Amino acid sequence: MIYTIEQIRQIARPIAAAYGVRSMRLFGSYARGEATEDSDVDILVDRGKLRSGFVMGGLYADLRDGFQKDLDLVTTQGADAEFLSRIRPDEVMIYEQ
């Protein structure tokens, strides 16, 4: 299945809210409108209240289960500045607290 950005928002928002993340932005092929059946979902997360790796693992699992697709979950705190500047032009906000 190839999701629309609105479908991605509908799946991600309740999960993000339940975990207390500050924001989620879509990047990669879905954000650029180039997704195929084989595309994974690339999400940049500002963790907000999330501090433990265990809870981040739960967030990852719930999003992956929601999308039924491979997922690339990157945190703003864990990504280097060069990577963030490279994806910034393609980012699409999908959740903001």
Model-inferred region functions:
Residues 1-23, 32-36, 48-97:
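Catalytic core of pol beta-like nucleotidyltransferases
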Residues 44-46:
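Short hydrophobic/aromatic beta-strand micro-patches
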